[in-house]
Amino acid sequence: MSWVFVPFQLLSVALAWAVLVLFVEIVAAHFERKGAATREGARPRVVVLIPAHNESHGIVPTIGDIRSQLGSGDRLLVVADNCSDDTAEVALASGAEVIRRNDAQHRGKGFALDFGLRSLAADDPEIVIIIDADFRVEDGAIDTLARVCSATQRPIQGMYRMSAPPGAAVNHQIAEFAWRIKNDLRPRGLRALGLPCQLMGSGMAFPRCALASVNIASGHLTEDLELGLLLASAGQAPLFCPAAQVRSVFPLTAAAARSQRQRWEHGHLAILIRRLCPLMGRALAQRNRDLLALSLDAAVPPTVLLGLLTLVATLINGAGALLGAGAAAFLLGVATITMLVAALLLAWNARGRDLITASGIRAIGPYLATKAGIYARAFAADKKWVRTKRGRGQE
């Protein structure tokens, strides 16, 4: 009967590797060398590309932030993608160039970006910077992204911050802490190890030649994650530049926040299932260190799912040990849980003390229940892109 427990024993080994990757990244982040971004050399000419679907309510501040940072010869291009509102008119009145795309059969950010890039073929800018339509862009971010991208001739990912809206429930603060782990500590750890980072979706800069090497026309839920892996496979793995910061807030309503989390995490799981094994095989065959590092990083499931799977597998393997299936997998599970708790405590000490208080700890139970529902629906989910409603009344 011990064969019944073999899948859970193998799962424990895989989860141990995932937790080890997470632990190493978080520990390495504590040893990151502080230094200014590379800003020497001539400032290249850039085009800032904003894909926008029904974003008339939030795009004006974004355009204002970017226009104040543009230099001579730079361009700001908004792709009004399948819009049913006045996004195009608002963007044009705010000083951006605007092109319209209407194709109901091909919906999603990747298709919008591909349309925008093809419209730039005659211009051929040295650097293309992508900013989402609802993001604020910190002073100097465009200049820093442009110079670092030009100096390294690699795709660059800036610091992508998401914060809880004012007056939000405690579960938003827990979500913000998880975001800080994923998009701050972990890429800092990879940077400290001399490794690339994942693309996150906004605050990204690309040498024009890098984008020409991959097909970005996609409606997949996490096209940014997939694009980073494809670039790494082509020898153009992205680098992290925390000095260039963009920021936004989580959706205010519970339904919108749940929709956004579901979209991100279903997409991550889909990439994990569909792409990672072939990419890891390619990385080993090509001896591509950057692709292997990003594949291992992407193989780490969302933190809550990682914890739930590890706990369940350990309990089942504990039962197996009592029934004579051997104790090795159970002991490995206990060690993995210990390592995961240590990693989360280190992360909380570095990035969560201002967010997770006693009241936050009490809210973890309901938050886990919400996340469990997200994962339960993952395998039946629509993999097509769906825009998140940002606030009350927004479509």
Each PLM stretch: what is its role?
Residues 45-47, 75, 226:
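Cell-envelope/extracellular polymer assembly enzymes that use nucleotide-activated donors
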Residues 1-42, 344-346, 371:
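N-terminal membrane-anchoring/stem segments of glycan-assembly enzymes
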Residues 64-73:
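Short, acidic, metal-binding catalytic loop of nucleotide-sugar glycosyltransferases
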Residues 72, 80-88, 103-105, 135-136:
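A conserved acidic beta->alpha catalytic loop
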Residues 100-102, 106-116, 120-125, 139-140, ...:
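Long helical/loop segments within the catalytic core of UDP-sugar-dependent glycosyltransferases
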Residues 27-31, 38-40, 297-381:
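Membrane-embedded multi-pass helical conduit in multi-pass membrane proteins
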Residues 60-61, 85-93, 100, 140:
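Acidic helix N-cap motif at the loop->helix transition within catalytic regions
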Residues 124-136:
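Short beta-strand-to-loop acidic/aromatic patch adjacent to the donor-nucleotide binding site
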